Amino acid sequence: MAGNTIGQLFRVTTFGESHGIALGCIVDGVPPNLELSEQDIQPDLDRRKPGTSRYTTPRREDDEVQILSGVFEGKTTGTSIGMIIKNADQRSQDYGEIKDRFRPGHADFTYQQKYGIRDYRGGGRSSARETAMRVAAGAIAKKYLREHFGIEVRGFLSQIGHVKISPQIIGEIDWEKVNSNPFFCPDESAVEKFDELIRELKKEGDSIGAKLTVIAENVPVGLGEPVFDRLDADLAHALMGINAVKGVEIGDGFAVVEQRGSEHRDEMTPNGFESNHAGGILGGISSGQPIIATIALKPTSSITISGRSINLNGEPVEVVTKGRHDPCVGIRAVPIAEAMMAIVLLDHLLRFKAQCK
């Protein structure tokens, strides 16, 4: 399994499984003399961690991060930063029945076919629990971007199932509202509808998909390395690598199919751009406008409704997932998406400074 690292100058490698002893990551490329402690990282982990509201999995993990290396007397040294989070609330017995069965819609089948072995407890390496370390690494990236470049990376939930936030709100996000509710949603009326929908799904034992948007503001012009390391290509790669993500849009995304060139092009004046249909990226290079990315997440297949599948011998079986799971994985994905965008932006900023200025 070689796909555990992302980035070139700012590099993040994660390790660990859902029901293992701990999760961990190594972060290379953090410039020296950045003031850093666990307290700078923990707030983002607390936004992602399970068991914090009735809308997410009841699994309870403190997700307390510990910095092992790369920080001395409260500042980064320029060497590798190692971090771990110990797992505490595993209930591996919940997964005994699927040891020899493949959960439909999960990575069980493909991991078994590829490697000939799999950790069936909570999905092992394929579990979204792994993303805790991405959030930890992303918190470092967000801090550096904010303090050294004035770049803010923030996200919000825009849709769960058929319930969408008001289009008018998207143009002027109230970030205080986003942080004031467990859905990370800027639309108070949508929050009430989200609540009703999730309650209904939990009663039925089912799940639902979601859509969320991440915005990076104050990004300078020039980030991105055409042609294969375009900024939008690397963002799509990073965001698509989040568990359950099935679609990524930059700017207007798939809506461009119905637009005409006269509408979609972002006209320019001496005062700047007149619109931002491109999502802040032109020709794979940041334009100086806000970078906007939207991701779609599938409904989790971990539900209590029986589903057809096969076992290791290829025989038909019925599968019911008994573990603790999110009725909508999109809710806790907001800080994960923020982290992945921040990791990509810092990597490209360091590459830009090394080559251009």
Swiss-Prot record:
One Pfam family here: Chorismate_synt
Keyword Amino-acid biosynthesis: yes
Disordered: region residues: 36-60
Source species of the chain: Haemophilus influenzae (strain 86-028NP)
Keywords associated with the record: Amino-acid biosynthesis, Aromatic amino acid biosynthesis, FAD, Flavoprotein, FMN, Lyase, NADP
Cofactor(s) needed: FMNH2
HAMAP family: Chorismate_synth
Cofactor, how bound (note): Reduced FMN (FMNH(2)).
Domain of life of the source: Bacteria
GO MF annotation: an example: FMN binding
Binding residues for NADP(+): 48, 54
GO process annotations (BP): amino acid biosynthetic process; aromatic amino acid family biosynthetic process; chorismate biosynthetic process
Functional description taken from the UniProt entry: This reaction introduces a second double bond into the aromatic ring system.
Protein name per UniProt: Chorismate synthase
Family matches, as PANTHER family: CHORISMATE SYNTHASE
Record note on quaternary structure: Homotetramer.
Family of this protein: Belongs to the chorismate synthase family.
Enzyme Commission number, as recorded: 4.2.3.5
Recorded GO CC terms: cytosol
Reaction it catalyzes: 5-O-(1-carboxyvinyl)-3-phosphoshikimate = chorismate + phosphate
Binding residues annotated for FMN, in chain numbering: 125-127, 243-244, 283, 298-302, 324
Gene: aroC
Stored InterPro entries: Chorismate_synth, Chorismate_synth_AroC_sf, Chorismate_synthase_CS
Pathway(s) this gene product operates in, as recorded in its UniProt entry: Metabolic intermediate biosynthesis; chorismate biosynthesis; chorismate from D-erythrose 4-phosphate and phosphoenolpyruvate: step 7/7
Keyword Cell cycle annotated: no
